[in-house]
C-alpha cells in the first residue's frame, strides 16, 4: 500500500512526463504539413539565392585557413516532401566545378594551369542528424558551422585546394531502417574559388556589408580612415603653443594645438572664424567610440623661468573647474610704441600689449588680432604697477650668454603704465566653460 506522499510524487512525475511528451509531439507536428510519406514531392530550395547570385556575378571567393574558416554566405536550404515520421541525415560535400587552377590577373579570374590532385573526400554531417523529417522541414537547414581548411587535420572540417573552384552539394539520406539515398542537390550560384586571402575588393566589400560578423573589419577601416583624415593638415591646424593645451575660441569650438614641440612652437594665429572641426563628443558629454588622434597630456611640461605658473595647463574637458589667470611677477606690460624683440627670448613668460591683444614677448610675430574673442583659462589678474617696460636688446647688451636677446628696462610714468594695465585687464574676461 503506497503512502499519500508517494502517490503525489507519482502524479507530479506523470505531469512532467506528459509535458515533455507534448513538447515532442508539437515538435513533430511543426513540419508535418510539408510532409509526404511517399517522398514523391520532395523539394529542396536555396535560401538567400539573390545574395548568392550577387556574389556569383563577381566570382565568389571563400577563405580557407589552417584552422578552418566558416563560409559566407551561409549555405541554407528549405526542404519539403519528406516523411514527417521518418529519420533523415543531411550531409554536405564539395566537388570541383571545372578542371582548372585559377589565378587573379588584372582584376579578373582567369584559368592558370592544371588542377592539383583532388583532396581526399571529406563529408560534413549536419549536427542535427539524424532527425525526423518534420524537424528538417519546419525551418531552413543551415550549414553555418562547416569550416573550410587547406590542411588535412580532421575535426569535421572540409579540406579544399586553394585557387580551385568548388560547388557545394547537399545529400539527404534516410536512416532508422534500410538506409538509402533519397536525393542530392547542388546549386550553381553557390560556386566559389577557395583562396587564402580575398583577391577582389568588391567581394570583400560585399562580405563586410552583408556579414554581421565582419562589422569589426568595417569599424577598423573607418577608424583608420578617420585617423588619416585627422592627421592631414587642414584649416584647423594653426601654428601655436602646445603648452597652452586646449583653446576656447569665441566660435564655441575646441581645437587642439598643432605643434608637437612645446618649447619651439610658432606664433599663434587663430582668427575668430577659423575652420576647426567641432567635437560633438565633448558637446554631448559622450565619449567617442574611437580613440582621439590627439593624445591628452597627463602632466604639464617644464619650461624655463617657471612659465607654467604664468599660464595654467588645461588637461582635458573634464577638469574645467574655474577659469582664472594666476598672477606672475614676470608679466611686464609695455607701451604701444614699444617694439617687439627681434630675437627668440629665453623667457616665454614675457608678454607685451598690442592693440588690446596679448602677445608672447618671445615671438616675433606674436598674437596679432588673434585673441579678440578667445580666452585662456584664467580670470582678470591685477598687477602691481611697475616702472619699467620691455624693449628690444642686442646680444652685446648682456655679458652672459644666457641673457642674449633679453629685455632691458627703462623708467616710465605711472600713468602710462595704468593705461597699459587697463588694456590688459580689459582683454582678459571670465569665460563660462561648457556644461559637462
UniProtKB/Swiss-Prot annotation:
Any single GO CC term annotated in Swiss-Prot or TrEMBL for this entry: nucleus
Keyword check for Transcription regulation: yes
Keywords: Activator, Developmental protein, DNA-binding, Nucleus, Transcription, Transcription regulation
A biological process from GO: signal transduction involved in regulation of gene expression
Lineage top rank: taxon: Eukaryota
GO MF term (any one): RNA polymerase II cis-regulatory region sequence-specific DNA binding
Record carries keyword Nucleus: yes
DNA-binding region: 51-219
Entry-linked PROSITE patterns: TBOX_1 (PS01283), TBOX_2 (PS01264), TBOX_3 (PS50252)
SUPFAM superfamilies reported for this sequence: p53-like transcription factors
Stored InterPro entries: p53-like_TF_DNA-bd_sf, T-box_DNA-bd, T-box_sf, TF_Brachyury, TF_T-box, TF_T-box_CS
Gene3D superfamilies: Transcription factor, T-box
Localisation per UniProt entry: Nucleus
SMART domains, A to Z: TBOX
Annotated TM spans: none
Assembly information from the UniProt record: Monomer. Binds DNA as a monomer.
Task performed by this protein: Involved in the transcriptional regulation of genes required for mesoderm formation and differentiation. Binds to a palindromic T site 5'-TTCACACCTAGGTGTGAA-3' DNA sequence and activates gene transcription when bound to such a site.
Disease listed for this protein: Embryo lacking the T gene fail to form the notochord, the entire posterior region and the allantois, and die at about 10 days of gestation.
Protein name (Swiss-Prot/TrEMBL): T-box transcription factor T
Organism: Mus musculus (Mouse)
Amino acid at each position: 500500500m503506497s503512502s499519500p506522499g508517494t502517490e503525489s510524487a507519482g502524479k507530479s512525475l506523470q505531469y512532467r512526463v506528459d509535458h515533455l511528451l507534448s513538447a515532442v509531439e508539437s515538435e513533430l507536428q511543426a513540419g508535418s504539413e510539408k510532409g509526404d510519406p511517399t517522398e514523391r514531392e520532395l523539394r529542396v530550395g536555396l535560401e538567400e539565392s539573390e545574395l548568392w547570385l550577387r556574389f556569383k556575378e563577381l566570382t565568389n571567393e571563400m577563405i580557407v585557413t589552417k584552422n578552418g574558416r566558416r563560409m559566407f554566405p551561409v549555405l541554407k536550404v528549405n526542404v519539403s516532401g519528406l516523411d514527417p515520421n521518418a529519420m533523415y541525415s543531411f550531409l554536405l560535400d564539395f566537388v570541383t566545378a571545372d578542371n582548372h587552377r585559377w589565378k587573379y590577373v588584372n582584376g579578373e579570374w582567369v584559368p592558370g594551369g592544371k588542377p592539383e590532385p583532388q583532396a581526399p573526400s571529406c563529408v560534413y554531417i549536419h549536427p542535427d542528424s539524424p532527425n525526423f523529417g518534420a524537424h528538417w522541414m519546419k525551418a531552413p537547414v543551415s550549414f553555418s558551422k562547416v569550416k573550410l581548411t587547406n590542411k588535412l587535420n580532421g575535426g569535421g572540417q572540409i579540406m579544399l585546394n586553394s585557387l580551385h573552384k568548388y560547388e557545394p552539394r547537399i545529400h539527404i539520406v534516410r536512416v532508422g531502417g534500410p538506409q538509402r539515398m533519397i536525393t542530392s542537390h547542388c546549386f550553381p550560384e553557390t560556386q566559389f574559388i577557395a583562396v587564402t586571402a580575398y583577391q577582389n575588393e568588391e567581394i570583400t566589400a560585399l562580405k563586410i556589408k552583408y556579414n554581421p560578423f565582419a562589422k569589426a573589419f568595417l569599424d577598423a577601416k573607418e577608424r583608420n580612415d578617420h585617423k588619416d583624415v585627422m592627421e592631414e593638415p587642414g584649416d584647423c591646424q594653426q601654428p601655436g603653443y602646445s603648452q597652452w593645451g586646449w583653446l576656447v575660441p569665441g566660435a564655441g569650438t575646441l581645437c587642439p594645438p598643432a605643434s608637437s614641440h612645446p618649447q619651439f612652437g610658432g606664433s599663434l594665429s587663430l582668427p575668430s572664424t577659423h575652420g576647426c572641426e567641432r567635437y560633438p563628443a565633448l558637446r554631448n558629454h559622450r565619449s567617442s567610440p574611437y580613440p582621439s588622434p590627439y593624445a591628452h597630456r597627463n602632466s604639464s611640461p617644464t619650461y624655463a623661468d617657471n612659465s607654467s605658473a604664468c599660464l595654467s595647463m588645461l588637461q582635458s574637458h573634464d577638469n574645467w573647474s574655474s577659469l582664472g589667470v594666476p598672477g606672475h611677477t614676470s608679466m611686464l606690460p609695455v607701451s604701444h610704441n614699444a617694439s617687439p624683440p627681434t630675437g627668440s627670448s629665453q623667457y616665454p613668460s614675457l608678454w607685451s600689449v598690442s592693440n588690446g591683444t596679448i602677445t608672447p614677448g618671445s615671438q616675433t610675430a606674436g598674437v596679432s588680432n588673434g585673441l579678440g574673442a578667445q580666452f585662456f583659462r584664467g580670470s582678470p589678474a591685477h598687477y602691481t604697477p611697475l616702472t619699467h617696460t620691455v624693449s628690444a636688446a642686442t646680444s652685446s647688451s648682456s655679458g652672459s650668454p644666457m641673457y642674449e636677446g633679453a629685455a632691458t628696462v627703462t623708467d616710465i610714468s605711472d600713468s602710462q603704465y595704468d593705461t597699459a594695465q587697463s588694456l590688459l585687464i580689459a582683454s582678459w574676461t571670465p569665460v563660462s566653460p561648457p556644461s559637462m
